[in-house]
Amino acid sequence: MAKEWGYASHNGPEHWHELYPIAKGDNQSPIELHTKDIRHDPSLQPWSVSYDPGSAKTILNNGKTCRVVFDDTFDRSMLRGGPLSGPYRLRQFHLHWGSSDDHGSEHTVDGVKYAAELHLVHWNPKYNTFGEALKQPDGIAVVGIFLKIGREKGEFQILLDALDKIKTKGKEAPFNHFDPSCLFPACRDYWTYHGSFTTPPCEECIVWLLLKEPMTVSSDQMAKLRSLFASAENEPPVPLVGNWRPPQPIKGRVVRASFK
């Protein structure tokens, strides 16, 4: 069997390029954001979403993350504006987190690591299929939201309560009537740059919108996320933690801010 990628020392991020050479490409994500080097671009528009809660379908544990999957067969749940030239369809969201509250995000801001990072993955329907969009530099738009520790977030608890049904790798459960915009912070300011998926194959097809303001969750809520397993039901238990890729070289890319 081919070596499967993961986050351990033998198959972790420093090995991904062995199977997926683009992981050493010029437009890889995540990156470190150095705010003093980021320019405000007054041409950047506000962004907005119109998500249909009925498009949420399932929640699953694939051994790498927990993912919520949406119906993207037509323009039901859409992201518009910002740096984007047209509307993008929501396909899924997932999270990256650490083994403790002091790290877990993939992007960092002036050296600050957050407890987790939420990625909402959208694709450009002008390319007809998600698979085709993966081959285009503007095929995918990801809204990234940092999670910091503070007071509990009730809307996040809805997601966490579903985790009991997907404790182990390979489990999937219905997850309906959820509008992920309930997780968004009040402030819509963002940074944007061109990058990649942060998991193999690490395709360089992403317009990133990283929100400046994190959402706040409690330490107990983070502990619940870390109660998932990367192992299947019949295997020795392996906790699902530390599923983050460290920042990659920026290689001359420009990060723009929607705010001064």
Curated annotation (Swiss-Prot):
<dbReference type="GO" id="GO:0044320">
    <property type="term" value="P:cellular response to leptin stimulus"/>
</dbReference>
<keyword id="KW-0862">Zinc</keyword>
<feature type="domain" description="Alpha-carbonic anhydrase">
    <location>
        <begin position="3"/>
        <end position="259"/>
    </location>
</feature>
<keyword id="KW-0456">Lyase</keyword>
<dbReference type="GO" id="GO:0016791">
    <property type="term" value="F:phosphatase activity"/>
</dbReference>
<feature type="modified residue" description="Phosphotyrosine">
    <location>
        <position position="127"/>
    </location>
</feature>
<keyword id="KW-0007">Acetylation</keyword>
<dbReference type="Pfam" id="PF00194">
    <property type="entry name" value="Carb_anhydrase"/>
</dbReference>
<keyword id="KW-0479">Metal-binding</keyword>
<dbReference type="GO" id="GO:0032869">
    <property type="term" value="P:cellular response to insulin stimulus"/>
</dbReference>
<dbReference type="GO" id="GO:0016151">
    <property type="term" value="F:nickel cation binding"/>
</dbReference>
<dbReference type="GO" id="GO:0006979">
    <property type="term" value="P:response to oxidative stress"/>
</dbReference>
<dbReference type="InterPro" id="IPR036398">
    <property type="entry name" value="CA_dom_sf"/>
</dbReference>
<feature type="modified residue" description="Phosphoserine">
    <location>
        <position position="219"/>
    </location>
</feature>
<feature type="region of interest" description="Involved in proton transfer">
    <location>
        <begin position="64"/>
        <end position="67"/>
    </location>
</feature>
<keyword id="KW-0318">Glutathionylation</keyword>
<feature type="modified residue" description="Phosphoserine">
    <location>
        <position position="29"/>
    </location>
</feature>
<feature type="modified residue" description="Phosphoserine">
    <location>
        <position position="43"/>
    </location>
</feature>
<feature type="modified residue" description="Phosphoserine">
    <location>
        <position position="50"/>
    </location>
</feature>
<dbReference type="GO" id="GO:0009617">
    <property type="term" value="P:response to bacterium"/>
</dbReference>
<feature type="modified residue" description="S-glutathionyl cysteine">
    <location>
        <position position="182"/>
    </location>
</feature>
<dbReference type="GO" id="GO:1903751">
    <property type="term" value="P:negative regulation of intrinsic apoptotic signaling pathway in response to hydrogen peroxide"/>
</dbReference>
<keyword id="KW-1015">Disulfide bond</keyword>
<keyword id="KW-0963">Cytoplasm</keyword>
<dbReference type="GO" id="GO:0005634">
    <property type="term" value="C:nucleus"/>
</dbReference>
<keyword id="KW-0597">Phosphoprotein</keyword>
<feature type="binding site">
    <location>
        <position position="119"/>
    </location>
    <ligand>
        <name>Zn(2+)</name>
    </ligand>
</feature>
<feature type="modified residue" description="Phosphothreonine">
    <location>
        <position position="129"/>
    </location>
</feature>
<dbReference type="GO" id="GO:0043066">
    <property type="term" value="P:negative regulation of apoptotic process"/>
</dbReference>
<dbReference type="GO" id="GO:1903427">
    <property type="term" value="P:negative regulation of reactive oxygen species biosynthetic process"/>
</dbReference>
<feature type="binding site">
    <location>
        <position position="94"/>
    </location>
    <ligand>
        <name>Zn(2+)</name>
    </ligand>
</feature>
<dbReference type="GO" id="GO:0030017">
    <property type="term" value="C:sarcomere"/>
</dbReference>
<feature type="modified residue" description="Phosphothreonine">
    <location>
        <position position="73"/>
    </location>
</feature>
<dbReference type="InterPro" id="IPR001148">
    <property type="entry name" value="CA_dom"/>
</dbReference>
<dbReference type="InterPro" id="IPR018338">
    <property type="entry name" value="Carbonic_anhydrase_a-class_CS"/>
</dbReference>
<dbReference type="GO" id="GO:0097305">
    <property type="term" value="P:response to alcohol"/>
</dbReference>
<dbReference type="GO" id="GO:0045471">
    <property type="term" value="P:response to ethanol"/>
</dbReference>
<feature type="binding site">
    <location>
        <position position="96"/>
    </location>
    <ligand>
        <name>Zn(2+)</name>
    </ligand>
</feature>
<comment type="similarity">
    <text>Belongs to the alpha-carbonic anhydrase family.</text>
</comment>
<dbReference type="GO" id="GO:0097421">
    <property type="term" value="P:liver regeneration"/>
</dbReference>
<feature type="modified residue" description="Phosphothreonine">
    <location>
        <position position="216"/>
    </location>
</feature>
<comment type="function">
    <text>Reversible hydration of carbon dioxide.</text>
</comment>
